[in-house]
């Protein structure tokens, strides 16, 4: 701002006004209304010109300027927000004709990535979150408190995490904007590396993060003495999270979001209620987006989303990312889906009603903040009027969850009737010309309209009288905004114009006049129309405010309708795709018969059927080692099992003939890897970081899906790590594990470790080619068919032939991976050395494997190798 403020006294009055406003909003692009344009100046102009690719001009020799028409502002603002900027809109708040001196201007709106109501910015099937993060000590432990809100739906939640859990949580939440204290600059720089590049970090003053300040703001907003009524205990470890929630409300007030009364609830996100899915798992299972291009196409969500309105779509998205962990809650959803599956008439009738209901959550937010149009208000009334019909359809349901949903719905018949009587069915997309309040709703408005209408009839009468008086048959009475009402006469008839006609305008082929009688009725019409427009706007505001007083009830109905929509979506998928109801239990066993990959079977289409596969885990079978070549279906099989478990715990039926599943607390995946160049991490280090996360956090109730562990390093190093991980999982964790590998030597673990069982992806060899059957069967295989895969990929024949020669030579070598000599495995580490090598034995025994990360284990192994090469000394 220094550059902009220099020489302020030399600027024009308007520019001084601009600089005064800009000084109050230094972090925002200031859009300054000048006539029919929004203008930006100085550095803002340079930024806006570049971001929007519009012309950069100059107001004076030293003031850069860029702008765009006010009527197109929503689209331009949307582009700026998508690029991560914050925008302050400064409008003219008085008519320039009435201004004494410079026109008065005020900030009328502030838009940021996390605070926007614009349809041009929002995806109606996604939430748009604003998050706040605060750090406080609970006892001796530093905790990260997170609050997040979607201002367009009024969803407002808090949660408390350890600082190291924060990156994964925020990456999963995917907020558009995050609020931090300026005291946390270093922490935010580190955190940014794990967030999408478009996420905006807004740094606020530290005083906003005080406990006392936040508590005052929260209690004032919710008009309560405590938050216990929302199930939140201030002393229950939520101190940091409540600070973050208070910061969010302060930020919304600071950004002039004054109509916040529609935000009626705040709740705690209880992690114990949901299966934990880290970002790697969400990405690897392609739950929300495809790994190939990040789009919805090819994702689980694309397959499962048959919702009929945006509220249900947003909830279904959350369900798939937060599967349930409590058995009774899972079974409640399954039973509800089952009834909808079995009762086709009910399912189709409910779906039809849901399709007629608009987005109550976002409509309410726009109505409460007076950002709406009459047509949207009318649609909300129609949606409310549909609730009794839905209740009647659901009156005989037997599933407990459907019964609870039906009973909890609260029709608002009086409000629906008032909206119906107030808003004209033909109300347009704008309010500028009036006519959107229905006739009969307000007596004063009807009278004003009658005056205007009667006066217009009198104008037509004047037109006829003047035609007769002047004998000019083409004379006509017309209107425009500049000259008002006038009489237009062609030049050819100018000699017939009476003396009492007062000229108003001369055109090429006509003259325009007025007369006393026309002036009299013009005043009556314009006065009545002006008052009518003002009264209509007032009536509409009052109606919006009345709707806002019912915000809590409308939001409760919206949540119930969204849940019903998501359950119907699950039911429609179950019917369309031949899914089955899984049997859920509290045990750790898992049994899937003829399971299918929910996404791949849809992509294959009718011309190619998906090959189903079984999967079984119990006390005798806890780890499945799956060998076989690439393209044989190992990775797809791993993902298939993960997706079936996830769908079951989200409340859906599953793609299988039958499924009996113990509730899983977490799903971990280690499938594929790539360099993390921004953090300076190699493929192998990324792989080891992910593997370490699994080993440190998995429990007996977890499901581990591990694909090609150790392939990022040399063969022997990689195999050693894979072997050691298998031992650790079996002996220390006991989690259900699918372990796909090219290391055929790992098949030996079946004989050495209890619970390890070999499976392989079947292949049929013919004289000319290899056929991948994509069937997972019992037993191991010792052939990777890598050369055959290379041939299928189109490698030159010379390369293929030479590869066969090299492979034949390598297979003749007497190369063996060191194996344990002891008949029984009692240790957690592979025995690589003979009994006589005492020094090596002592060195190995001194290693505390329980404290080593996989990477440290690799380094320790390298030291032991060097010792072995030097003869153990």
Swiss-Prot record:
GO molecular function: ATP binding; ATP-dependent DNA damage sensor activity; damaged DNA binding; mismatched DNA binding
Keyword DNA repair: yes
Keyword DNA damage attached: yes
Cysteines paired by S-S bonds: none
GO cellular component terms listed in the entry, alphabetical order: cytosol
CDD domains noted in UniProt: ABC_MutS1
Alphabetized InterPro entries for the sequence: DNA_mismatch_repair_MutS (IPR005748), DNA_mismatch_repair_MutS-lik_N (IPR007695), DNA_mismatch_repair_MutS/MSH (IPR017261), DNA_mismatch_repair_MutS_C (IPR000432), DNA_mismatch_repair_MutS_clamp (IPR007861), DNA_mismatch_repair_MutS_core (IPR007696), DNA_mismatch_repair_MutS_N (IPR016151), DNA_mismatch_repair_MutS_sf (IPR036187)
Residues annotated for ATP binding in this entry: 628-635
Coiled coil segments of this chain: none
Keywords: ATP-binding, DNA damage, DNA repair, DNA-binding, Nucleotide-binding
Pfam name, any one: MutS_V
GO biological process per UniProt: mismatch repair
Matches recorded under HAMAP family: MutS
Biological role: This protein is involved in the repair of mismatches in DNA. It is possible that it carries out the mismatch recognition step. This protein has a weak ATPase activity.
Family of the protein in this entry: Belongs to the DNA mismatch repair MutS family.
Protein name: DNA mismatch repair protein MutS
UniProt organism field: Chlorobium chlorochromatii (strain CaD3)
Lineage: Bacteria, Pseudomonadati, Chlorobiota, Chlorobiia, Chlorobiales
């Amino acid at each position: 701002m220094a550059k902009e403020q220099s020489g302020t006294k030399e600027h024009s009055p308007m520019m001084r006004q601009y600089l005064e406003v800009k000084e109050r909003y230094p972090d925002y692009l200031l859009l300054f209304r000048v006539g029919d344009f929004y203008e930006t100046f100085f550095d803002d102009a340079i930024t806006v010109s570049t971001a929007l690719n519009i012309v950069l001009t100059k107001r004076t020799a030293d003031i850069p300027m860029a702008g765009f028409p006010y009527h197109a502002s929503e689209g331009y603002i949307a582009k700026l927000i998508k690029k991560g900027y914050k925008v302050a809109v400064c409008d003219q708040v008085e008519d320039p004709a009435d201004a004494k001196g410079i026109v008065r201007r005020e900030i009328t709106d502030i838009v940021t990535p996390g605070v926007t109501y614009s349809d041009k910015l929002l995806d109606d099937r996604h939430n748009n979150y604003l998050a706040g993060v605060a750090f406080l000590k609970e006892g001796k432990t530093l905790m990260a408190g997170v609050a997040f809100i979607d201002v367009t739906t009024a969803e407002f939640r808090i949660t408390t995490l350890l600082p190291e859990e924060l990156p994964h949580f925020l990456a999963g939440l995917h907020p558009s904007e995050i609020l931090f204290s300026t005291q946390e600059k270093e922490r935010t720089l580190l955190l940014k590396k794990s967030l999408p590049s478009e996420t905006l970090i807004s740094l606020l003053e530290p005083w906003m993060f005080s406990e006392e300040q936040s508590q005052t703001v929260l209690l004032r907003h919710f008009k309560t003495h405590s938050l216990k009524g929302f199930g939140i205990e201030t002393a229950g470890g939520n101190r940091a999270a409540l600070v973050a929630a208070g910061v969010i409300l302060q930020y919304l007030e600071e950004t002039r979001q004054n109509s916040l009364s529609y935000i009626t609830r705040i709740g705690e996100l209880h992690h114990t209620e949901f299966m934990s899915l880290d970002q790697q798992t969400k990405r690897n299972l392609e739950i929300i987006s495809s790994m190939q291009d990040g789009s919805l196409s090819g994702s689980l969500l694309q397959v499962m989303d048959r919702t009929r309105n945006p509220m249900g779509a947003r909830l279904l998205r959350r369900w798939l990312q937060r599967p349930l962990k409590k058995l009774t809650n899972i079974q409640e959803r399954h039973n509800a889906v089952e009834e909808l599956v079995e009762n086709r008439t009910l399912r189709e009738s409910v779906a039809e009603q849901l399709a007629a209901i608009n987005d109550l959550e976002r409509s309410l937010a726009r109505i409460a903040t007076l950002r709406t149009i009459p047509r949207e208000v009318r649609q909300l009334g129609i949606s409310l009027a549909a609730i009794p019909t839905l209740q009647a359809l659901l009156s005989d349901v037997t599933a407990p969850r459907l019964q609870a949903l039906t009973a909890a719905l609260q029709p608002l018949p009086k409000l629906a009737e008032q909206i119906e009587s107030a808003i004209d069915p033909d109300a347009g997309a704008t309010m500028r010309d009036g006519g959107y309040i229905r006739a009969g709703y307000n007596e004063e408005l009807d009278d004003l309209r009658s005056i205007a209408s009667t006066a217009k009839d009198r104008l037509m009468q004047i037109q006829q009288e003047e035609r007769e008086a002047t004998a000019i048959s083409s004379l006509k009475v017309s209107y425009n905004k500049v000259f008002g009402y006038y009489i237009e006469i062609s030049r050819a008839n100018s000699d017939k114009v009476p003396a009492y006609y007062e000229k108003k305008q001369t055109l090429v082929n006509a003259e325009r006049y007025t007369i006393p009688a026309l002036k009299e009725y013009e005043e009556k019409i314009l006065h009545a129309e002006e008052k009518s427009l003002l009264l209509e706007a007032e009536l509409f505001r009052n109606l919006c405010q009345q709707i806002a007083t019912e915000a809590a009830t409308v939001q409760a109905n919206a949540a119930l309708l969204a849940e019903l929509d998501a359950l119907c979506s699950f039911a429609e998928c179950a019917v369309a795709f031949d899914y089955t109801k899984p049997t859920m239990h509290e045990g750790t066993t898992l049994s899937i018969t003829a399971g299918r990959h929910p996404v791949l079977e849809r992509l294959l289409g009718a011309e190619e059927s998906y090959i189903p596969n079984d999967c079984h885990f119990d006390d005798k079978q806890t780890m499945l080692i799956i060998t076989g070549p690439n393209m044989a279906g190992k990775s797809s099989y791993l993902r298939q099992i993960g997706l079936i478990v996830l769908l079951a715990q989200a409340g859906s039926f599953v793609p299988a003939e039958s499924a009996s599943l113990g509730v899983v607390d977490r799903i971990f995946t280690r499938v594929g890897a790539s360099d993390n160049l921004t953090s300076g991490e190699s493929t192998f280090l990324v792989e080891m970081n992910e593997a370490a996360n699994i080993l440190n956090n998995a429990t007996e109730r977890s499901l581990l899906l591990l694909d090609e562990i150790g392939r990022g390093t040399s063969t022997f190093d990689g195999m050693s790590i894979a072997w050691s991980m298998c031992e650790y999982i079996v002996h220390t964790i006991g989690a259900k594990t699918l372990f796909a590998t090219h290391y055929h030597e790992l098949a030996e673990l079946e004989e050495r470790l209890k619970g390890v069982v070999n499976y392989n992806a079947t292949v049929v060899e013919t004289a000319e080619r290899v056929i991948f059957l994509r069937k997972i069967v019992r037993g191991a295989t010792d052939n990777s068919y890598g050369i055959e895969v290379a041939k299928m990929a189109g490698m030159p024949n010379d390369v293929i032939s030479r590869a066969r020669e090299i492979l034949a030579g390598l297979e003749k070598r007497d190369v063996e991976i060191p194996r344990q000599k002891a008949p029984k495995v009692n240790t957690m580490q592979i025995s690589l050395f003979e009994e006589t090598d005492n020094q090596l034995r002592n060195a190995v025994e001194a290693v505390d494997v329980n404290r080593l990360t996989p990477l440290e284990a690799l380094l320790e192994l390298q030291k032991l190798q060097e010792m072995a090469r030097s003869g153990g000394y």
